[in-house]
C-alpha cells in the first residue's frame, strides 16, 4: 500500500511539474486570431515572427492544423534569423501549419547557419505525410548562407 501511494504521489508531482511547460508551449503570443481556418493567427510584427520561430524551435510546437496569415509587410531588421523548423530528425521541430503571406513581403531576412535547414522556414511538413503544411502567397527578401560541413 505504501509503494502504491508513493507511486501515485510521484506521478502526481511529475504531472504538476510538467504542466506549466506544456501550457507555455502552446501560448505563443501573436497579433490576434485563434489559429483556425476562419480566424487564423495574425502575424503583423517582427515579434510575431520571432514568437512563431521560438515556439516551433524551442518549445517544439508544430502547429499542425493551425492557420497563420501575414497582415502587412514586416522588416526583420537584418537581425540574425533562426529558420522556423530547424531539424527534421527531431519530432516537433518542423512547421506543420498553413502560413498565408497574403501577398505581403518579409524583408531584412538574414540567415547564416551551419546546416541545410535555411530560409525563413527551415523545415515545413517534411516528416508528416498529408499534414497540410504549406507556405503560400509570400515574398521574402534578404540574405541566406549555409555552410554544411561533414566529418566523413
Where are these regions (language model features)?
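Positively charged n-region of N-terminal signal peptides that target proteins for export
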Residues: 1-10
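Bacterial N-terminal signal peptides
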Residues: 11-17, 21
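Surface-exposed repetitive/solenoidal architectures
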Residues: 23-152
Amino acid at each position: 500500500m505504501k509503494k502504491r501511494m508513493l507511486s501515485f504521489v510521484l506521478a502526481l508531482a511529475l504531472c504538476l511539474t510538467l504542466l506549466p511547460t506544456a501550457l507555455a508551449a502552446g501560448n505563443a503570443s501573436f497579433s490576434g486570431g485563434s489559429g483556425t481556418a476562419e480566424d487564423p493567427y495574425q502575424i503583423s510584427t517582427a515579434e510575431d515572427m520571432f514568437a512563431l520561430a521560438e515556439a516551433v524551435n524551442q518549445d517544439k510546437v508544430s502547429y499542425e492544423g493551425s492557420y497563420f496569415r501575414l497582415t502587412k509587410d514586416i522588416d526583420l531588421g537584418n537581425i540574425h534569423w533562426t529558420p522556423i523548423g530547424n531539424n527534421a530528425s527531431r519530432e516537433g521541430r518542423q512547421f506543420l501549419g498553413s502560413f498565408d503571406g497574403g501577398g505581403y513581403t518579409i524583408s531584412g531576412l538574414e540567415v547564416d547557419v551551419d546546416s541545410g535547414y535555411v530560409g525563413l522556414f527551415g523545415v515545413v511538413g517534411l516528416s508528416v505525410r498529408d499534414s497540410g503544411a504549406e507556405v503560400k502567397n509570400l515574398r521574402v527578401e534578404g540574405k541566406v548562407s549555409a555552410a554544411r560541413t561533414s566529418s566523413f
